[in-house]
Amino acid sequence: MVNVLKGVLIECDPAMKQFLLYLDESNALGKKFIIQDLDETHVFVLAELVNFLQERVGELMDQNSFPITQK
């Protein structure tokens, strides 16, 4: 039997990959989304969840950046 899944290859640094693995393990998106963990900088994920992943990564980046205040 063959299972076909539509996926997207993501290339990222190891720190971002750890964040993606954390989201996958904690079922933050409601289900597992990583199809295959390929190497230290590549993962293959479900195509249907790419937009939501981009939002979550954007939220993480916003939390890690500081706004520039005007004096």
Swiss-Prot record:
Example of a GO cellular component annotation carried by this entry: cytoplasm
Record-level GO BP terms: nucleotide-excision repair, preincision complex assembly; transcription by RNA polymerase II; transcription initiation at RNA polymerase II promoter
Keywords attached to this entry: Cytoplasm, DNA damage, DNA repair, Nucleus, Transcription, Transcription regulation
InterPro entries: TFB5-like_sf, TFIIH_TTDA/Tfb5
Assembly: Component of the 7-subunit TFIIH core complex composed of XPB/ERCC3, XPD/ERCC2, GTF2H1, GTF2H2, GTF2H3, GTF2H4 and GTF2H5, which is active in NER. The core complex associates with the 3-subunit CDK-activating kinase (CAK) module composed of CCNH/cyclin H, CDK7 and MNAT1 to form the 10-subunit holoenzyme (holo-TFIIH) active in transcription.
Classification via PANTHER family: GENERAL TRANSCRIPTION FACTOR IIH SUBUNIT 5
Name of the protein in question: General transcription factor IIH subunit 5
Record organism: Gallus gallus
